Structures are given as C-alpha cells and as structure tokens.
Amino acid sequence: MCIILIMHHGKIIILSGPSGVGKGSIEKLLLEDEKLKLKFSTSVTSRKPRVNEIEGKDYFFRSEEEFSELIKEKKFIEWSRHLNNYYGTLKSEVDKILGAKFNVLIEIETTGALNILKYYKKKNMLNDVISIFILPPRLEELETRILNRGSETKEEIKIRIKKAKKEIKLKNKFKYNLTNNFLHECVEEVKNILKREIHEI
C-alpha cells in the first residue's frame, strides 16, 4: 500500500502491504526517479540485521531496551511489534526530510500504516493522506517470495502468511489497491497515482 500525505512543505508516501509482496523492490525503483523528489525515511527496529542491510540506511538497529526508551521519549509517529520485534517511524526522520523540501517515502507493514493514519487523523490531516495497498497476485506466490528470501524459518513463514491473510482483509482501509503482478508495471501505476495526486510532480 502506499499512503501519500499531502503537506505544503512536502509529501509523505507510504508503501504498505503483506511481507514479501515486493514493497522493497517498488521503493527502490521509486527512489531512482529523481523527478519524484523522494527521500527514504529510515525506521528503527529491534530485529537483527539481514545480510547486506546497512545501519542508518535500511534501518536504525537498536536493542529492545533502546527502543523502549524511544517510546518513553515519544520519538515515534507510530510503532508496533511484529514477529517478536519492534518497528517504529521516527518523527525526526520525517521532519528532517520535509524540512529539506523533499517528499518522504515510508515502506511499512500494515499495522504501522494504519497507526500513521490514526496519527494524522488526530492532527485533522486525514484528508491529506492518500493510501495504496500492494497485493500479491496469489498467496502461493507470496509464500514462494518469502521462502526465496532465505531469511525466515518455516514456522516464521507460516506466521507471515497467516498475518498476510488478515492484512489483505484490511485493504479497503486504503484509497488505492494495486496488485504486484509485474514489478515494473506496478511501479508505473504507483508513479501515475503520484502524478495525479501531487500536481507539482
């Protein structure tokens, strides 16, 4: 899914959907398009880094104790617990990007995306939010993608598929639903939405 928050000094684009649906690949291709003026908002997580993940680029990797301190200090727009790990979106990261007159790109799982919607609803800015939920062509393909990633156990994959089924039921909470049949076609669909919704792009 993708949520775009329209703000005078920049936009927030949130990509969301089940794990393994291709959010990371879509995000990478969007960031390559300089016309979109996108900057990736690096989230905080308590999970261990995967192979080739870089501190400060893919995530800020913190211990559970450090994450808890950030919660107490109200540093997050949203945070959630997923597969026994914490994930959170830092207010400071979003503000820094918007302050530099860029649009913010946030790739986030569904619970976090819904929490962001709640956050901006409280700020009476819900009309400025555009959401896009990325769907898999089939659940079987989603399972294959996660399996090919090689970073989860069979039990973790079962949990992810079960969670994906629940997340897909929430798709109507987002303004747009896109199916990622073919990566480049899906990216073009996202870009077309951005061009329609953000007139200056």
From Swiss-Prot:
Cysteines engaged in disulfide bonds, as pairs: none
SMART domains cross-referenced by the UniProt entry: GuKc
Domain Guanylate kinase-like, residue spans: 10-195
Gene, per the UniProt record: gmk
Name of the protein described by the UniProt record: Guanylate kinase
Localization, UniProt: Cytoplasm
GO cellular component, one term: cytosol
InterPro entries cross-referenced by the UniProt entry: GK/Ca_channel_bsu, Guanylate_kin-like_dom, Guanylate_kinase, Guanylate_kinase_CS, P-loop_NTPase
GO molecular function, one term: guanylate kinase activity
Keywords attached to this entry: ATP-binding, Cytoplasm, Kinase, Nucleotide-binding, Transferase
Binding-site list for ATP: G17, P18, S19, G20, V21, G22, K23, G24
Function in brief: Essential for recycling GMP and indirectly, cGMP.
EC number: 2.7.4.8
Catalytic activity: GMP + ATP = GDP + ADP
Record bears the keyword ATP-binding: yes
Family label: Belongs to the guanylate kinase family.
NCBIfam families to which the protein is assigned, alphabetical: guanyl_kin
PANTHER family per UniProt: GUANYLATE KINASE, GUANYLATE KINASE-RELATED
Domain of life: Bacteria
